[in-house]
Amino acid sequence: MTKEHKKMYKAGKYWAVATLVSASILMEVGVTTHADAVENNKYDGTANVNIDCQANVDGKIISTDDNATSGSTKQESSIANDNATSGSTKQESSIANDNATSGSTKQESSIANDNATSGSTKQESSVANDNATSGSTKQESSVANDNATSGSTKQESSVANDNATSGSTKQESSVANDTKTAVVDESKNTSNTENDNSQLKQTNNEQPSAATQANLKKLNHEAAKAVQNAKIDAGSLTDEQINELNKINFSKSAEKGAKLTFKDLEGIGNAIVKQDPQYAVPYFNAKEIKNMPASYTVDAQTGKMAHLDVWDSWPVQDPTGYVSNYKGYQLVIAMMGIPNTPNGDNHIYLLYNKYGDNDFSHWRNAGSIFGTNENNVYQEWSGSAIVNDNGTIQLFYTSNDTSDYKLNDQRLATATLNLDVDDNGVAIKSVDNYHILFEGDGFHYQTYDQFANGKDRKNDDYCLRDPHVVQSENGDRYLVFEANTGMEDYQSDDQIYNWANYGGDDAFNIKSFFKLLNNKNDRELASLANGAIGILKLNNDQTNPKVEEVYSPLVSTLMASDEVERVNVVKLGDKYYLFSATRVSRGSDRELNAKDITIVGDNVAMIGYVSDNLMGKYKPLNNSGVVLTASVPANWRTATYSYYAVPVEGHPDQVLITSYMSNKDFASGEGNYATLAPSFIVQINPDDTTTVLARATNQGDWVWDDSSRNDNMLGVLKEGAVNSAALPGEWGKPVDWSLINRSSGLGLKPHQPVNPSQPTTPATPVNPSQPTTPATPVNPSQPTTPATPVNPSATTTPATPVNPSATTTPAKPVNPSQPTTPAKPVQAGQATATNFVDQRLPQTGENNSQSQTMSFIGILLAMFGSLLGFLGIKKRRND
């Protein structure tokens, strides 16, 4: 072959290679574009929210009215309304109205009523209205208004209100309302905190001043690092503040259990304020709520027939944790008593109904478990119950002793119930083996004597109650219970200096640290707060158990809260879910509690944790642990508390939540006894978040089945509606909290729980109706393009050029019996194309017909280019 022939041969070869590579790139672009389109079209899982009107600001007092004007320009609160669209990225809030735009950035608003003043500071809350859709990906709370769409990527809140306009720049506004009055006294206790914190100036990019450098030298290494991380100008610190910072214990030693931190407490309290439908207890139809017929029975103290309040209740469960089908009956034990009885009337009764019977009126009362000669000195509080191997019922409960002027000396106790069961009902035959199990050990858990001899009984809260039995697969039994920490990690002022108790970044921790130091009352509460969720192991004697071993707490709430009650554990799959009811009022942030009471009218919540094993370590659900939050004021008929979760048969990712409704002693009006509430479903998501579902039952339903759902029990937040969550006269009624007497519920806003037909985000990719895109390339009916070149029936000549024995003579390309002569020049390109196609196999969303078309075009172009090269070679040879 001459030199010129070689040049022409190479030119033809390079042309063919370039053609094939170009075709491959074109096909790849087409596939990638399609895959990106599918990826970007993922369902974000955010549910629509049904809102009427009501605006809410995350401050001490909120009162809103239609046509009210509020606005600001650097603002941490936000309101959005009809047809408004928010598309911010990392936004703390946005306020908009009907076709109105808000550009405000830091507003310290105060909303006042006739003759009342409210000073809300640092609003982070948000409220929204009808039919809003939120598309936030990482969002702490987001609710929007009529047909409003929010597309924020990291959004802390959004709030909406009809006809509200926002447009001022750094404005301390006041809005008058003729219908509601609200006064907050907390400002006297917290204003100095804000003033002190305001002295902590932020650093800038300038050279540190001499004062800054001098103060940094006064701080120890860890304290200086925390101040710098918080971007605080050390020059603004006083000598007293420097001295306090140097006392902080920054140790990162491993904790023995999980912690509910000060940051978690804030998250729980703010979740109540935001009324996020992900956590908020559903609204119930107040007119459908009935007193429990079975609560009319012989009272344990008086021995006479009486109507009783019903409070904490729990089912008899089988060893797996499901509600027991006990010889055809479902059994429930409940605390009950005559309302407004001096010194209390709190005892436990056995209730029963046919298993699976959802009719609230069919429940019957087998009577007081410990007879009708009880007194108010020795009372029984809540616990749990399990079926023993011999068919008896093992009851675990709280024995409360108030003799000798004791202030609720609580002890964990047990007893064995022998029942007579027939077609006519259930009767208590005998109660055996009653005895005290545990009184605290002083080391892991506080004893009553430690509490009684403490420095401040008035503000301290002693807890050793609510034992919940858990049976492991090997038959071992454990009790999980509410307690306070013992000397192992005891309550003290030192806990305020324990950095691990704060739970936030250095900026949050330092701010909270000085907040507690500068507020005498909060500091006192923080030094006393030592709530705990404890655990102990029982021996193998089911009917007469003793304590075998006591362990460190599963969860402690040092410095943050003094009470986490109604503990219970639900095993779902291979995970253990630990739940507890709590009140923000038992925490050490009174300003946060005041905010909850003012805006919602209640401060109750249910918290939850998850672990791979019973002994932990537990991780909080939803980051802060919040699972449920109060929805209505505490004195409404539909106010709920004492939440208890049970597993749902056939649904390993759901729990049924039970509670009681209407606070005792006729809090919601004369004749409205505390009663069992409708139950509802909470979804447990794979990412350790939870979602309240729009599924409610009749009152007192403990077993979810196909007949359980009753949408008539669901209500709305609308005064005068047929299914209103409030009875006539309840709107605006003040709640009398023994130490706090104020108007409440001024920031209530409608919310709507998620409908199961609108799956939460994790459910989307595994929904059979929405197949994941990788299924396309492996579908036999849609062969991928690489099938053509590797088809045995295709007599492609590439085998010849790669054979070492094959010469590179041009004889073969001109043989008419081998029309695929371009084999030699496309050898390298063909190999590249084949490898590239193979790499595309896992691409998502590939359009098969598009791929085949592009492949065919690429082959034609390659053949054409090769033919040109061949013709060039032939022509040159002929010449």
Swiss-Prot record:
Residues 1-37 form the signal peptide. Disruption phenotype: The wild-type strain metabolizes sucrose with formation of acetate, mannitol, glucose, kestose and levan while cells lacking this gene do not metabolize sucrose, do not liberate glucose from sucrose, and do not form mannitol, acetate, kestose or levan. Growth and acidification are lower in wheat doughs prepared with the deletion mutant than in those employing the wild-type. Residues 66-213, 743-830 are annotated as: Disordered. Residues 66-177 are annotated as: 7 X 16 AA tandem repeats of D-N-A-T-S-G-S-T-K-Q-E-S-S-[IV]-A-N. Keywords: Calcium, Carbohydrate metabolism, Cell wall, Glycosyltransferase, Metal-binding, Peptidoglycan-anchor, Repeat, Secreted, Signal, Transferase. This is Levansucrase. Residues 66-180, 189-213, 754-821 have a biased composition (Polar residues). Disulfide bonds: none annotated. One of its GO terms (biological process) is carbohydrate utilization. It is a peptidoglycan-anchor. Sequence repeats lie at residues 66-81, 82-97, 98-113, 114-129, 130-145, 146-161, 162-177. Fructosyltransferase that catalyzes the polymerization of the fructose moiety of sucrose to produce levan polymer and the fructo-oligosaccharide (FOS) 1-kestose. Also displays sucrose hydrolase activity.
